UniProtKB/Swiss-Prot annotation:
EC number: 7.6.2.10
Cellular component GO terms, alphabetical: ATP-binding cassette (ABC) transporter complex, substrate-binding subunit-containing
Organism: Salmonella choleraesuis (strain SC-B67)
GO biological process, one term: glycerophosphodiester transmembrane transport
Subunit structure: The complex is composed of two ATP-binding proteins (UgpC), two transmembrane proteins (UgpA and UgpE) and a solute-binding protein (UgpB).
NCBIfam families: PRK11650.1
Every ABC transporter domain range: 4-235
MF (Gene Ontology): ABC-type glycerol-3-phosphate transporter activity; ATP binding; ATP hydrolysis activity
Keyword Cell cycle belongs to the record: no
Name of the protein in question: sn-glycerol-3-phosphate import ATP-binding protein UgpC
Function: Part of the ABC transporter complex UgpBAEC involved in sn-glycerol-3-phosphate (G3P) import. Responsible for energy coupling to the transport system.
Reactions the enzyme catalyzes: sn-glycerol 3-phosphate(out) + ATP + H2O = sn-glycerol 3-phosphate(in) + ADP + phosphate + H(+)
Enzyme class: translocase
Residues involved in ATP binding: 37-44
Length: 356
């Protein structure tokens, strides 16, 4: 197995504006890292830099302890799986999987052995003579993965491989990818805009925004302790509730526009007078009562999701979303009294957006 290291890597198209800010990442042997972020955040550009399809402006890339920054893609020991499968339509499944090995001059027996083994792992044994047009979307994606597997690369690179599949098939393919990684233990770098893919597949997640790695951590870490307001808003469905306000002069209240306020602990007294953003996830808000000092939420709409429900409403001028149990279905216009547990709240600096 082999590791991957990015050392202060940057990318600029015009020599002035850096679309990838200096970024350092160490991927351990056999680790599965997912880069996630909105369109235009730089994740696919970074993946292409690792693959050698984009030139690195500055910094270095290391694969299997070898510096590959200026190497051609074919010499880097990588295999890439694309969003659009990139299969040859006139070739059979077997020929598609074997083609890369054939042009490298491998023996016929060696090629056949690798293709048969990959087909067995991916359950493609009975499809080897078919053409891509005779396959479903999921089968085509498995062929694309098989073509990567037969190369026995040091690193797998996945560029949004499930984006073209329907919702049900994406779930199935996520499970297959998890099983495949447990079996092969090959170092993998995976790009997606889908946070569900990121959270379910990754051993560590790198959340990107405007060319910056906002946070690198386990799925649990980025969910429970988001490093910035951006991460808090991007990870989680529905998104975290974010309320802009200020720490009171006494340091014991979080004050919001319209005379609203929430008590806060003594830990934040050193931030008195500072603008802050308070965050809390919809699933961490509990039902309370007026007598218990609950926050009144006027329900605007209710989303019925089956297993649970989402109530969207207003607390004064502040918008809030709360996740409710299946049997709790408040009518529009009704009032819910809510408890925002202090240990489930997050505070972010009002200027930098960084976690306090």
């Amino acid at each position: 197995m082999a590791g991957l290291k990015l050392q202060a890597v940057t990318k600029s198209w015009d020599g002035k504006t850096q679309i990838i800010q200096p970024l350092t990442l160490d991927v351990a042997d056999g680790e599965f890292i997912v880069m996630v972020g909105p369109s235009g955040c730089g994740k696919s550009t970074l993946l292409r830099m690792v693959a050698g399809l984009e030139r690195v402006t500055s910094g270095d890339i290391w694969i299997d302890r070898k510096r590959v920054t200026e190497m051609e893609p074919k010499d880097r020991g990588i295999a890439m799986v694309f969003q659009n499968y990139a299969l040859y339509p006139h070739m059979s499944v077997e020929e598609n999987m074997a083609w890369g090995l054939k042009i490298r001059g491998m023996s016929k027996a060696h090629i056949e052995e690798r293709v048969r083994e990959a087909a067995r792992i991916l359950e493609l044994d009975g499809l080897l003579k078919r053409r891509p047009r005779e396959l479903s979307g999921g089968q085509r994606q498995r062929v694309a993965m098989g073509r990567a597997i037969v190369r026995e690369p040091a690193v797998f690179l996945f560029d949004e491989p499930l984006s073209n599949l329907d919702a049900k098939l994406r779930v199935q393919m996520r499970l297959e990818l998890q099983h495949l990684h447990r079996r092969l233990r090959t170092t993998s770098l995976y790009v997606t805009h889908d946070q569900v893919e990121a959270m379910t597949l990754a051993q560590r997640v790198m959340v990107m925004n405007k060319g910056v790695a906002e946070q690198i951590g386990t799925p649990v870490e980025v969910y429970e302790k988001p490093a910035s307001r951006f991460v808090a808003s991007f990870i989680g469905s529905p998104a975290m509730n974010l309320l802009d306000g200020v720490i009171s002069a006494s340091g014991d209240r979080f004050e919001l526009p319209g005379g609203l306020a929430l008590p806060i602990g003594a830990d934040y007294r050193g931030h008195a007078g500072r603008n802050m953003t308070l965050g809390i996830r919809p699933e961490h808000i509990a039902l309370s009562s007026q007598a218990e000092g609950g926050v009144p939420l006027t329900v605007d709409t209710l989303e019925f999701l089956g297993a649970d429900n989402l109530a969207h409403g207003r607390w004064g001028d502040q918008k809030l979303v709360v996740r409710l149990a299946h049997q709790q279905r408040p009518a529009a216009g009704s009032t819910l009294w809510l408890h925002l547990p202090e240990h489930q709240r997050h505070l972010f600096d009002g200027e930098t957006g960084q976690r306090v």
